């Protein structure tokens, strides 16, 4: 009897499966469901000309159908593809995305892009870098006359004649540097995070370029920002200037990296408390100078992220030949 019961249950299951399959066949294909259009615009606002990445890969089709992507800009120009780049000039612009499946289903999403005109007397310089593995961007407005004034200052080529600290404390660019530092400060939540963020900026957004022959002189921060590149002293001056603008202590240091007792490199030093030091990646590389614990900030990394406190030179206190504190 038990065998018969088992066979009966199996037979019933088979009949049910056949019935469901037959019902589906009788009813025909299920009705198509419309896709959902969605996209990201990065950045969504900035100074013109503003180049924006439009990414529609967040769009979805509930039936799993393949999608096509059609873009319309200000009800005029168009483009296609899941990811497109578009440059917008001054004004507010409307971007429309239409996604379609292969069975006639469609959906539309729209966003506005605000491209702000650059104020007269300024130039806009955009920067891109990575901080703790996350891509970052910003655009700084640079007063053109102030930049030209710094660029036009007469200098000589004798490196030993330079007081590098003078390039940090010059007062004319203080309000401008304070604005730039304020942008970074608003993106962080502590002094430690701000220092890390500013260091990542100068390492990643400012290309390392040795001074050309017969041009061995430092640059003021605005010169480095306009060029987007600089030698070790240029990036260190910029970094220390950003910290100074927010009242964060630091120093420029002229150091000996090859043990010949002659200065050959400029970097920054940041005084750190014992708890801060314990949180650093390279806490064993700290320098003690006059009883103060300093973390090395190597700004001329040529794009390589070197965390605060990591000393690529293996410096000792005797290798620090001159310091300009701020």
Regions found by a protein language model. Give the residues of each.
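Hydrophobic/aromatic-rich core segments of domains that either
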Residues: 234-326
